[in-house]
A protein has these predicted regions:
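Elongated, amphipathic alpha-helical interaction scaffolds
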Residues: 1-254
Length: 254
């Protein structure tokens, strides 16, 4: 994993940053998810392929569980520095693995309590529901992620029956967040350190705007080391690394 990927993951693992991204992009800036309602989930899932019965490891960037009023839902933030042409299928893999994990836990609970469904072919009781799994793909690139945005964008259909087949295939759209093109209204909704990253991305290709951004912005950072790690990795500018080392040295003396 590259330095940029690690820096992106490192910042997003902070719950205040994670919840901020979710609130802005899922709930229109409404503070629905709080940091205290989040708990970190494993970034690796072990799955067994039906085709050959072999175990496989599935990697997710930053997954967390949100618990509200005894109801859970799962959120995963996927970082992409450029378009990935298989992302709809990758996301299907994430979702399948997470839902199957819940099914396995529910069936194990039924086994322990003897509360089996009738008939057994149901596998779960009618009252047993799964927690939603939502993936947000964060596009850090300056280019808009246009396609693929759903499974159908990846498929090639026979011309004579394409329309008929399309109706029977779930589209499985993915949630792409093009950070560099977010509106001023959206950017103003960010409350965490992530707002500085989005503003940086919005003016990265305009040297004049970028210089002005650094000159007039008063950075009030909750996670300065993580932010500077990200900036250093993205710009390949050692000065940000030096600034981080100075912060760490100052904190050590304090």
């Amino acid at each position: 994993m590259g330095a940029k990927d690690l820096a992106e993951k490192n910042l997003l693992q902070y719950k205040d940053v994670f919840s901020d991204i979710v609130n802005v992009n899922l709930f229109g800036g409404r503070c629905y998810v709080s940091a205290k309602e989040l708990s970190r989930e494993p970034g690796e899932l072990i799955t067994k392929a039906v085709s050959d019965d072999k175990l496989r490891q599935l990697q997710m960037d930053v997954p967390m569980k949100c618990k509200k009023d005894n109801i859970n839902f799962f959120l995963c933030l996927e970082n992409q520095s450029d378009k990935n042409n298989i992302m709809p299928v990758r996301d299907m893999g994430y979702q399948h693995a997470k839902y199957m994990e819940q099914i396995k836990e529910a069936k194990e609970s039924n086994r322990k309590t003897g509360n089996y469904p009738t008939p057994m072919t149901k596998e779960l009781n009618d009252s047993q529901k799964l927690s939603p799994v939502i993936t947000l793909v964060l596009n850090y690139s300056q280019k808009e992620w246009e396609k693929p945005r759903c499974l159908n964008d990846m498929l090639e259909f026979p011309e004579d029956i394409g329309e008929e087949l399309t109706k029977w295939i779930p589209e499985h759209p993915i949630c792409i967040i093009n950070l560099a093109s977010q509106s001023e209204t959206t950017i103003c909704q960010y409350q965490s350190d992530f707002k500085y990253i989005v503003r940086y991305l919005c003016c990265r290709n305009d040297r004049k705007k970028l210089d002005e951004y650094f000159q007039i912005t008063e950075f009030e950072l909750d996670h300065p080391e993580a932010f500077l790690d990200w900036l250093s990795a993205v710009t390949n500018d050692r000065r940000y690394r030096k600034a981080k080392e100075l912060i760490e040295e100052t904190e050590g003396k304090g």
